[in-house]
From Swiss-Prot:
This is ATP synthase peripheral stalk subunit F6, mitochondrial. GO terms for molecular function: proton transmembrane transporter activity. GO terms for biological process: proton motive force-driven ATP synthesis. The modification N6-acetyllysine is found at K9, K14, K47, K52, K67, K73. The modification N6-succinyllysine is found at K52, K67. It is found in: Mitochondrion; Mitochondrion inner membrane. GO terms for cellular component: mitochondrial inner membrane; proton-transporting ATP synthase complex. Keywords: Acetylation, CF(0), Hydrogen ion transport, Ion transport, Membrane, Mitochondrion, Mitochondrion inner membrane, Phosphoprotein, Transport. The modification Phosphoserine is found at S76. The lineage of its organism: Eukaryota, Metazoa, Chordata, Craniata, Vertebrata. The gene is ATP5PF. InterPro entries: ATP_synth_f6_mt, ATP_synth_f6_sf_mt.
């Protein structure tokens, strides 16, 4: 590996520090209680708007094939 200049080294060190903090906290880093309150409030709004579905799963869609009728073509 090539040697990093001081700015690059500082940047890489901060990224590693952030990753470590995130892994230990198990969620957002440096988020206070107001963050969780805001998140809960916004999720509540979404549930009210979109039918109280689980916001962590992708919805299941069921599509039915259209029914076609056979139509006789007139002979010309």
């Amino acid at each position: 590996n090539k040697e990093l200049d001081p700015v690059q080294k500082l940047f890489v060190d901060k990224i590693r520090e952030y990753r470590t903090k995130r892994q230990t906290s198990g969620g957002p880093v440096d988020a206070g209680p107001e963050y969780q309150q805001d998140l809960d409030r916004e999720l509540f709004k979404l549930k009210q708007m979109y039918g109280k579905a689980d916001m962590n799963t992708f919805p299941n869609f069921t599509f039915e094939d259209p029914k076609f009728e056979a139509v006789e073509k007139p002979q010309s």
